[in-house]
Amino acid sequence: MSEHAESMRTIWYETEGDKVCIIDQTQLPHALQIITLETLADACRAITDMQVRGAPLIGITAAFGVYLSLKQNPQSLLSACQQLAATRPTAINLQWALTQIQQELQALDTADQIGSALSLARQLLADDAGACSAIGDNGLQILKALLKQKQQSQPSEQSGENACLNILTHCNA
């Protein structure tokens, strides 16, 4: 993959075709493979097989999994949540997302649950993207300050454009 590749999300919903897509993270960094999630089983497999990684992404995948399940069987809310919860029993964001979805959807008529499940999953995705962007914005300011400090403290032959920072990233980078 190019270091200058365009920015992508790791999960997204395509209104055209009514489908959920993920980047298969087991293939990174050697290949960029897009997988379409069409069923609850697909969402469960993506979580279990670690095709999606990172706590927020696992929770968002589960939320879309509930939507996919309800599309196929409008009566499946509780069983879908149970199956998804079993994929990673210790994943806090997974349990949190499923609790949020269950609480919101149980209060609705079955006929309204499908559209609401999609809206909730998309809102979780948007909220997480905003949080990650804020993390990036804060981190950028810190990195700029560190680079400036490094440029000022190094001998002249190593400063300026030749100064660099070595960065190791984790999770939400």
Task: Describe each region flagged by the PLM.
Residues S2-K19, A85, P89-N166, H170:
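C-terminal binding/interaction regions
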Residues R9-A111:
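Long amphipathic alpha-helical segments
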